[in-house]
């Protein structure tokens, strides 16, 4: 099971940097081809919409977000609050990161992120996490190993 940080999805949707885009899309394709279960905190909808709205029209943003939501399992705020609160207290991470890390913890998932600080905090919280930009090969090997 996988939790993808918003950064991975943004890199896949908007190719600001060709290398980040390639890595993100390859990981998404592998997750799809292996039919791996993806969990996301419901806050993803707001965060992803906010980022994409800076670069795309409302209509396109809504379409992107709706398409992603069709393929993931959203975990409600209430289900993650206590875990996210504990993670925030133990790591000092950003609030939104605490929800993604908490989602990985609650669903026993691997966290994938293009945010190095988030990955560091996830590891402090005992979560298996991969920094996509520098641990791409290790992540691909790990995903391939999942039955």
Regions found by a protein language model. Give the residues of each.
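Active-site-proximal, substrate-binding regions of enzyme catalytic domains
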Residues: 21, 25, 39-86
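Short amphipathic alpha-helical segments and helix-helix/interface helices
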Residues: 25-28, 100-101, 119
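Alpha-helical elements of the RecA-like P-loop NTPase motor core of helicases
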Residues: 11, 50, 120
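Acidic, PIN/NYN-like endoribonuclease modules and their adjacent C-terminal/linker elements
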Residues: 1, 107-110, 114-147
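Alpha-helix N-cap/helix-start capping motif
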Residues: 7, 42, 78-81, 115-116, ...
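Active-site neighborhoods of divalent-metal-dependent phosphate/nucleic-acid chemistry enzymes
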Residues: 73-117, 146
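Structured helix-beta-strand junction loops
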Residues: 33-35, 71, 107, 125
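Short, well-structured N-terminal submotif of metal-dependent ribonuclease cores
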Residues: 1-39, 55-60, 140, 146-147
């Amino acid at each position: 099971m996988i939790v993808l940080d918003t950064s991975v999805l943004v890199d896949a949707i908007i190719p600001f940097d060709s290398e980040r885009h390639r890595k993100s899309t390859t990981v998404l394709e592998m997750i799809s081809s292996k039919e791996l279960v993806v969990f996301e905190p419901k806050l993803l909808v707001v965060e992803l919409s906010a980022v994409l709205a800076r670069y795309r029209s409302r209509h396109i943003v809504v379409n992107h977000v709706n398409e992603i939501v069709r393929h993931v399992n959203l975990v409600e705020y209430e289900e993650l609050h206590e875990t996210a609160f504990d993670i925030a207290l133990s790591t000092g991470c950003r609030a939104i990161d605490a929800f993604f890390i908490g989602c990985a913890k609650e669903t026993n998932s691997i966290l994938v992120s293009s945010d190095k600080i988030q990955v560091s905090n996830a590891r402090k919280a005992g979560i298996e996490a991969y920094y996509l930009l520098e641990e791409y090969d290790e992540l691909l090997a790990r995903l391939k190993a999942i039955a």
